[in-house]
Amino acid sequence: MAVERIHAREILDSRGNPTVEVDLYTHKGMFRAAVPSGASTGIYEALELRDNDKSRFLGKGVLQAVDHINSTVAPAIVGSGLSVVDQEKIDNLMLEMDGTENKSKFGANAILGVSLAVCKAGAAEKDVPLYRHIADLAGNSDLILPVPAFNVINGGSHAGNKLAMQEFMILPVGAESFRDAMRIGAEVYHNLKSVIKEKYGKDATNVGDEGGFAPNILENSEALELLKEAIDKAGYTDKIVIGMDVAASEFYRDGKYDLDFKSPDDPSRYISADELGDLYQSFVRAYPVLSIEDPFDQDDWEAWSKFTANVGIQIVGDDLTVTNPKRIERAVEEKACNCLLLKVNQIGSVTEAIQACKLAQENGWGVMVSHRSGETEDTFIADLVVALCTGQIKTGAPCRSERLAKYNQLMRIEEELGDEARFAGHNFRNPSVL
């Protein structure tokens, strides 16, 4: 029923940076949620409040956000008498109290921590699994297990190599179940490790923030070639497609793009959006690339619309849309992309994340649920992706416990659903046809 007590604290994420954790108590017990944090963040994301006290955690402390919860948000929610099943009412109460467009008063990390904990408590109050409760909140009767998009080669802001593009992913669309997809993904991952070790030496198999490898290569096509080789070696050529997250805003310079942005600056090597689009087209022709995320800068709308009109593959908006209904509406209008990357901490509450997802789905888009590069052991997004029937999730490589926590939870959910479990497979872009 009502919330008895809320207590927030500062913990560390998978990168050793502080983040917010919230414990919420009802008569049913204690419910805990932790908030993730991104490295390559879109400028239109809701504000993640950091202390900026350089003497603590290099300015990245979150004691202010924690204090906002403990001193202001907690007493208001406890005092409101609202039931934990009233997710929207509690979220709206926090949004009204914050009163800013981008949650800069309390911080999206404060509001989201409480929102996630409320959602977990709401499921317990109804005596249903978390995924069932979220499905109810979204008005969904269906539940669908997603295709995992494993980020197995890291570049961009996630890695210390020369590679400009941030993520190269494998999607086992030909798997028969989520568990089968995990096995295929893990086997390809291990084959990739041996391919990289053979070509670049053992130190090239060190892993990045999300568990993928970061060999010191410069050419993006080389990363695709490595994936192709590992997939062939594992024997899954007919079962796997490739996805990329370019995170192009990270190397956008003066209206052009710098594919060697980690080297000393040299404007003579910048390329135009059209040239970059041609490069993607060549990838799509040469490799089974079926999904490209953030192919252009978050404000290069014209390039997005032109490219999306010219290709038949999935074009995912992340920095472009930042899980924000206003940005999504504009992207729909301009036909800028055809899939939303859903990150709960970009918008900052469960209610708004569900609304963003529904808005995208109602406009015929796909939706991919996503982790952040700075993660915790919290598994909320595993339940979320099943509940929202998006059919696809990216939460890193099959390596590093904060990544596997989500994948393992999805295997448990599939097991729990038994014969009712449906796996998105080849329909990952439009699982509603299942």
Curated annotation (Swiss-Prot):
The active site is at E210, K343. PROSITE patterns: ENOLASE. The keyword Magnesium applies. GO terms for cellular component: cytosol; phosphopyruvate hydratase complex. It catalyses: (2R)-2-phosphoglycerate = phosphoenolpyruvate + H2O. It comes from the Eukaryota. Its cofactor is Mg(2+). GO terms for biological process: glycolytic process. Keywords: Cytoplasm, Glycolysis, Lyase, Magnesium, Metal-binding. Mg(2+) binds at D245, E293, D318. InterPro entries: Enolase, Enolase-like_C_sf, Enolase-like_N, Enolase_C, Enolase_CS, Enolase_N. Substrate binds at H158, E167, E293, D318, S370, H371, R372, S373, K394. One of its GO terms (molecular function) is phosphopyruvate hydratase activity. Transmembrane segments: none annotated. The keyword Manganese does not apply. Mg(2+) is required for catalysis and for stabilizing the dimer. Expressed in the brain and, to much less but significant extents, in the pituitary and adrenal glands. SMART domains: Enolase_C, Enolase_N. Pathway: Carbohydrate degradation; glycolysis; pyruvate from D-glyceraldehyde 3-phosphate: step 4/5. Its EC number is 4.2.1.11. Belongs to the enolase family. PANTHER family: ENOLASE, GAMMA-ENOLASE. This is Gamma-enolase. The gene is ENO2.
